[in-house]
Amino acid sequence: MTVFDIYIAFVSWGSGGKNRPVLILEESADSATVFNITSQYESKSDEIRTKYFVINDWRQAGLDRLSYVDTNNTVTLPLTSIDRKNPIGRLTAADEMRLLKFIDQ
């Protein structure tokens, strides 16, 4: 796994969780730091939307619909929760550069 790769991971919260696409930021021996990727935008508050980065090249990234990187929080996941054998894809170079600028704002 490398930075800006996209994988499916089981992301848990409280007593639940679901499989979702995640953007790899960093990998260690037993965990990875990621941003969640979501297609849910319209239902979010204006405040939350300001932290959502639109993936312009979502098809090239291997996603099946317009999606957003949730830069609100990073999530640290155990590597066992990530389907590392089957990466979805990765951000294009253009989206990588845009994301870095977005985060630096």
Segments predicted by a language model, with ranges:
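Short coil-to-beta transition motif at edge beta-strands of beta-rich domains
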Residues: 1-12
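A generic structural signal for short, non-catalytic loop/turn and secondary-structure boundary residues
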Residues: 2, 27, 46-48, 62-64, ...
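Intrinsically disordered, low-complexity peptide-like regions
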Residues: 3, 17, 34, 39, ...
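Compact nucleic-acid interaction/catalytic patches
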Residues: 9, 15-19, 24-57
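C-terminal terminal-subdomain/extension
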Residues: 55-105
